[in-house]
């Protein structure tokens, strides 16, 4: 899928956010059944990558040199955009609340704005600053005001590292494809990232545990593999392809702000499938996030991530059983 229109890129970005946002509602039953967060995310990443593999092989026919040229980009996505982000998030939620860790990680768009500010020594466009304030306020309301509290400094440091990994994901995804199809890039990054996470689990760095009985979902008992397959296909395979495709068109800054809609979609799916309450504050938060995205888009491409940053090649968090930060599973 190759697009060039900014409007089409925005639509694809929203589809990606919606896809990422489904993960919490479908993974939560597995977590409640005894799956560890690291086992759930390792399975979704590996299965999602394997689902994309046949499509990637077809899309890469005649384009294998493009994959070789992008080898460092693929490696960076697998190690930083997938594995490191997940690893640091899991480390963070061992000592700080899940909502707090999710809120910190989702501040990645502001990190990108700050990096550009420092590197260009130019104050960002006023609309970008306004959009950033709206987005932060919306995140706090959707994730939950209780996410802001005094917590363990080490946990905060790990969450900050996860935020950096999330920002890196957007910078990598927004780089020119140089002939590499998004589906091929996503498949390679997910398979390699899943193998890294699996290796960390096998060596005991990440705890891996799973159960294989029926799980309740939407008022009925389903085999354990049903929600896992949905998450792997929709929340991982489709979501990563859509995210990478849209980031190439929109750029890292706007794509990262649009991704904040994940928390809104996560709350909506939790309400529809799990019966979780959708509060007026969450609806207001969603409106603020939309306002922030609109402001950033209105600012245009000014102050986008500079080319000097992109060669550094800097998703998407893991839901550990609460709905508000369900997008923690996403990157």
Predicted regions and their residues:
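Glycine-/small-residue-enriched transmembrane alpha-helix faces in small-molecule transporters
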Residues: 1-43, 148-175, 183, 199, ...
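C-terminal-most transmembrane helix of multi-pass membrane proteins
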Residues: 2-3, 11, 45, 224-226, ...
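Hydrophobic alpha-helical transmembrane segments of multi-pass integral membrane proteins
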Residues: 8-11, 39-55, 131-134, 154-161, ...
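Specific transmembrane alpha-helical segments of multi-pass solute transporters/efflux pumps
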Residues: 19, 24, 53-99, 104-105, ...
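Juxtamembrane C-cap of transmembrane helices in multi-pass membrane transport proteins
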Residues: 19-34, 47, 87-96, 104, ...
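Membrane-interface helix termini and inter-helical loops of multi-pass transporters
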Residues: 25-37, 94, 142-153, 203-223, ...
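Specific alpha-helical transmembrane segments that line the substrate/conduction pathway
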Residues: 39-50, 86-123, 162, 252-271
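Hydrophobic transmembrane alpha-helices of multi-pass small-molecule transport proteins
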Residues: 52, 115, 124-145, 163-166, ...
């Amino acid at each position: 899928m190759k697009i060039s229109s900014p409007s089409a890129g925005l639509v694809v970005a929203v589809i990606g956010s919606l896809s990422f946002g489904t993960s919490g509602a479908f993974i939560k039953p597995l977590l409640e059944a005894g799956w560890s967060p690291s086992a759930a995310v390792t399975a979704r990443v590996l299965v999602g990558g394997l689902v994309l593999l046949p499509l990637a092989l077809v899309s890469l026919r005649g384009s294998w040199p493009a994959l070789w040229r992008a080898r460092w980009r693929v490696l960076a996505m697998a190690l930083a955009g997938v594995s490191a982000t997940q690893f640091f998030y899991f480390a963070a939620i061992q000592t700080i609340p899940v909502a707090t860790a999710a809120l910190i990680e989702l501040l990645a768009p502001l990190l990108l704005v700050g990096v550009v500010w420092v590197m260009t020594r130019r104050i960002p466009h006023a609309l970008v600053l306004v959009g950033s304030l709206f987005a932060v306020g919306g995140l706090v309301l959707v994730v939950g005001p209780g996410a802001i509290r005094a917590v363990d400094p080490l946990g905060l440091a790990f969450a900050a590292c996860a935020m950096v990994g999330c920002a890196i994901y957007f910078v990598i995804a927004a780089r020119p494809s140089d002939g590499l199809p998004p589906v091929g890039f996503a498949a390679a990054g997910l398979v390699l990232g899943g193998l890294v996470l699996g290796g960390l689990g096998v060596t005991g760095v990440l705890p891996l545990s799973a159960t294989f009985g029926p799980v309740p979902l939407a008022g009925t008992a389903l085999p354990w593999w049903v929600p896992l397959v949905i998450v792997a296909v929709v929340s991982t395979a489709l979501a990563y392809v859509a995210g990478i495709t849209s980031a190439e068109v929109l750029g890292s800054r706007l794509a990262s702000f649009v991704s904040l809609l994940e928390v809104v979609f996560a709350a909506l799916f939790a309400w529809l499938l799990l019966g979780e309450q959708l509060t007026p504050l969450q609806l207001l938060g969603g409106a603020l996030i939309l306002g922030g995205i609109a402001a950033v888009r209105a600012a245009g491409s000014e102050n986008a991530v500079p080319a000097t940053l992109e060669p550094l090649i800097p998703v998407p968090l893991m839901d550990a059983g609460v709905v508000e930060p369900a997008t923690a599973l996403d990157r």
